[in-house]
């Protein structure tokens, strides 16, 4: 029977947080951010397996969090790579061989909703690849190399990508292997498919589905958690 697997990418060092502690291990309401992220997927009925990718020297810390909070469905904890795309590739190689749909999600994005997860799986099955996100609230400017505004794109045509990004497993694995062979750099997994001519369906995420990367995000995260609970 085919599985829906999720790769949680927790290999970042969190330089923008100005903290010696990696952002995924910082706490909101006395629990690490990683707990909230893992718990959201482990309690979702459509998720069969979690593969956690982290820094090699943080594997033990992650194991302790999983044990302390009795997180289910984590099949493996694997070390990350030099870049995010290397970490994702390590995760892809570690998922179960009967995986059909794989979701790739930032560990520092703890407020993903059940609907976002479910819709991602549905659209990945339908289109082969899907990513959630939001239309920007602010006006976006394009500037030239001298710092002057040269264009103002229509906000309705713009999309701020979030995670999870959801894929047919064989498609994303094949594209990552090509990426590695050609030594290309990308900043998210939809770019991996775009580089090889594959289409990605974009669907509605949530303005609360923030990635916690700065001290200000921690404050906002506490406010979001209070509203959710």
Swiss-Prot record:
Which BP terms in the Gene Ontology apply to this protein? isopentenyl diphosphate biosynthetic process, methylerythritol 4-phosphate pathway
Identify the HAMAP family for this entry. IspD (MF_00108)
Q: Which keywords has UniProt assigned to this entry? A: Isoprene biosynthesis, Nucleotidyltransferase, Transferase
Instruction: Give the family from UniProt.
Output: Belongs to the IspD/TarI cytidylyltransferase family. IspD subfamily.
- A single Gene Ontology molecular function, please? 2-C-methyl-D-erythritol 4-phosphate cytidylyltransferase activity
Residues marked Positions MEP for the nucleophilic attack (site): 155, 211
Keyword Transferase in annotation: yes
Q: What does this protein do?
A: Catalyzes the formation of 4-diphosphocytidyl-2-C-methyl-D-erythritol from CTP and 2-C-methyl-D-erythritol 4-phosphate (MEP).
Q: Which gene encodes it?
A: ispD
Residues the record marks as site: Transition state stabilizer: 16, 23
What is the name listed in the Swiss-Prot or TrEMBL entry for this protein?
2-C-methyl-D-erythritol 4-phosphate cytidylyltransferase
């Amino acid at each position: 029977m085919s599985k829906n697997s999720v790769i949680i990418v927790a290999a970042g060092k969190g330089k923008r947080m100005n903290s010696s502690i990696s952002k995924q291990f910082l706490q909101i309401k006395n629990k690490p951010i990683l707990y909230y992220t893992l718990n959201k997927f482990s309690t979702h009925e459509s998720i069969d397996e979690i593969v956690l990718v982290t820094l090699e020297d943080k594997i033990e810390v992650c194991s302790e969090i999983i044990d302390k909070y009795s997180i289910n469905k984590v099949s493996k904890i694997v070390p990350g790579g030099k870049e995010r795309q290397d970490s994702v590739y390590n995760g892809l190689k570690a998922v179960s061989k009967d995986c059909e749909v794989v979701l790739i999600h930032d560990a520092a994005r703890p407020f993903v909703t059940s609907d976002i997860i479910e819709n991602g799986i549905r659209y990945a099955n339908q289109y082969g690849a899907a990513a959630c996100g939001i239309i920007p609230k602010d006006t976006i400017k394009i500037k030239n190399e001298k710092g002057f505004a040269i264009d103002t794109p229509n906000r309705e045509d713009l999309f701020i990508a979030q995670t999870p990004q959801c894929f047919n497993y064989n498609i994303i694995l094949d594209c990552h292997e090509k990426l590695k062979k050609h030594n290309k750099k990308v900043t998210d997994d939809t770019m991996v498919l775009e580089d090889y001519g594959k289409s990605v369906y974009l669907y509605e995420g949530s303005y609360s589905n923030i990635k916690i990367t700065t001290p200000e995000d921690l404050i906002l995260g506490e406010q979001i958690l209070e509203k959710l609970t």
